Amino acid sequence: MLGQPTRAQLAALVDHTLLKPETTRADVAALVAEAAELGVYAVCVSPSMVPVAVQAGGVRVAAVTGFPSGKHVSSVKAHEAAAALASGASEIDMVIDIGAALCGDIDAVRSDIEAVRAAAAGAVLKVIVESAVLLGQSNAHTLVDACRAAEDAGADFVKTSTGCHPAGGATVRAVELMAETVGPRLGVKASGGIRTAADAVAMLNAGATRLGLSGTRAVLDGLS
């Protein structure tokens, strides 16, 4: 997307997100109500909160898997994804083993994604590559390799960040590189540190096709 989206166009690309450890059932119900009001694409919640979000109704539900470290055993990630889908989620955002990517073990990264892909057949699968870490501790080829592994494993999206790592969240450089590597075959979700309308528009113009936002209302209100 190039140029300035309308409020409705931007909202339709947003996963309205709440992943804090202290999140309550009431918080998730309020998140879903706000999501329906704002007209976003989906909400993104922890696996244990999927039933609450589904019961609240009126919006698609995405769940994270292996979040936020990505260090879970692949079979655990697969089980977590399957449980979320059985509870009514339609999309899975999984975290790869970042350490495996950094040391060049792309086969391990690919097989990890394949395990979740098999458990999430028919669902949209987004693969979180923690782009700020991969770009900050190595060079561009590590991020490129991780994105290619996601594509080879059958993912639908690559996603920049958990939003939890001190290295940072989405950047224009990372989104551009990810889009150049796998777009338009895969979508690119920018997430982490997108706090203003200008941030959101910059990510879309860099090639993002979905946005993960926690402060969605403020971002939408900031559109001129």
Curated annotation (Swiss-Prot):
- Give the pathway listed in the UniProt entry for this protein: Carbohydrate degradation; 2-deoxy-D-ribose 1-phosphate degradation; D-glyceraldehyde 3-phosphate and acetaldehyde from 2-deoxy-alpha-D-ribose 1-phosphate: step 2/2
Q: Which reaction does it catalyse?
A: 2-deoxy-D-ribose 5-phosphate = D-glyceraldehyde 3-phosphate + acetaldehyde
Q: Kindly list the biological process annotations in GO that this record carries.
A: 2-deoxyribose 1-phosphate catabolic process; carbohydrate catabolic process; deoxyribonucleotide catabolic process
What positions does UniProt annotate as the active site of this protein? D93, K159, K189
Domain of life per record: Bacteria
Query: InterPro entries attached here?
Result: Aldolase_TIM (IPR013785), DeoC (IPR011343), DeoC/FbaB/LacD_aldolase (IPR002915), DeoC_typeI (IPR028581)
Output the NCBIfam families linked to this UniProt entry.
deoC
- Its name, as the record gives it, is Deoxyribose-phosphate aldolase
**Organism source for this protein?**
Mycobacterium tuberculosis (strain ATCC 25618 / H37Rv)
